[in-house]
Regions:
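Eukaryotic partner-binding/assembly regions in large regulatory complexes
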Residues: 1-69, 116, 130, 145-149, ...
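Internal, well-ordered domain-core segments that constitute the primary functional module
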Residues: 86-159
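Positively charged, polyanion-binding regions of nucleic-acid-associated proteins
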Residues: 11, 74-95
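Short amphipathic alpha-helical segments
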Residues: 26, 75, 121-125
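A short glycine/small-residue-enriched secondary-structure motif
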Residues: 47-61, 75-80, 102-107
Length: 160
């Protein structure tokens, strides 16, 4: 039951920041009873990778409180998806520049929404997403400060 409690009470369990719980849950989710209970009784799915374990709890209908509190625009969610796609292709401890991420976002998202990094509001939106992802432990700032990007388009940050 501790495993289910951990999955319910944590948005995700990151190996790097919570090794003990990560390995405990990883070991327990291979138990067919727990897996069956989560999938058949609750109708949820366990997402497991070498870095993260997450219980994907999709509600039957959305409620106003269900969004990410830090996000203020729909664009924030679009940028989050692009950032997560970019990070998924990166290996652990692989450093990259903010400018590389921005180029990737432009190619992925430009089909769906307008991307104009000269706009303060769009740069601010990206900064909100980067800070959110960093707070969740999926990204580390190695050198620089992403919040400066909202004010200065030419600023550069090194991430890991």
């Amino acid at each position: 039951m501790k495993t289910i409690d951990l999955l319910l009470n944590n948005y995700w369990i990151v190996k790097e920041t919570d090794k003990e719980n990560y390995y405990a849950v990883k070991h327990e989710i291979n138990d067919k009873n727990i897996k069956r209970f989560i999938q058949e009784m609750l109708g949820w799915k366990i997402i497991h990778s070498e870095h993260v374990i997450k219980l994907e709890k999709i509600p039957s209908h959305a409620e106003p409180f269900m969004g990410i509190q830090e996000f203020t625009e729909i664009r924030d969610y679009c940028l989050l998806c692009a950032v997560l796609l970019y990070l998924e292709d990166k290996e652990e401890n692989n450093q990259f520049l903010l400018s590389d991420l921005i180029r990737y976002i432009e190619t992925v998202i430009s089909k769906y929404i307008e991307v104009d990094w000269t706009s303060f509001s769009q740069r601010k939106s990206l900064v909100r997403v980067l800070q959110y992802v960093e707070n969740k432990g999926l990204l580390k700032t190695y050198e620089g400060d992403s919040s400066i990007y909202s004010r200065e388009q030419s600023s550069e940050v090194l991430y890991e």
